[in-house]
Amino acid sequence: MASRGRKLGKSVHSAAQRALCDLMIAARKRAGLTQQALAARLSKPQSFIAKYETGERRIDVVEFIAICRAIPADSAAILAKVAKLV
């Protein structure tokens, strides 16, 4: 399936995926949270945060919303920035 003439690949290393990771890292840091602190808020291991922040794994939309609420971060603003790259 294509969007705006671009193929949507499954690569976790796409520009949009990297942008999402970078925006999530920036939001966490702006909130003054460590990976460990955010993980505790989500009842997840620190490795969960590390893996999506490094692009080792993707997060689904439900996880994304939960993470944004835990930070807290504006999920709509983050998605709007990522959408420009898709």
Describe every region a protein language model picked out:
Residues 22, 32-33, 59-62:
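Residue-level signal for the short linker/turn that defines the boundary of a DNA-recognition helix
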Residues 29, 40, 69:
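Alpha-helical residues within the helix-turn-helix
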Residues 19, 50, 57-60:
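Hydrophobic transmembrane-helix microenvironments that flank and shape a buried ionizable site
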Residues 62-78:
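DNA major-groove recognition helix of helix-turn-helix/homeodomain DNA-binding modules
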Residues 1-22, 26, 30-31, 73-77, ...:
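N-terminal flexible/basic segments that precede or flank functional cores
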Residues 32-52:
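Short alpha-helical DNA-recognition segment
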Residues 29, 43, 54-56, 83:
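Residue-level detection of the helix-turn-helix DNA-binding "recognition helix"
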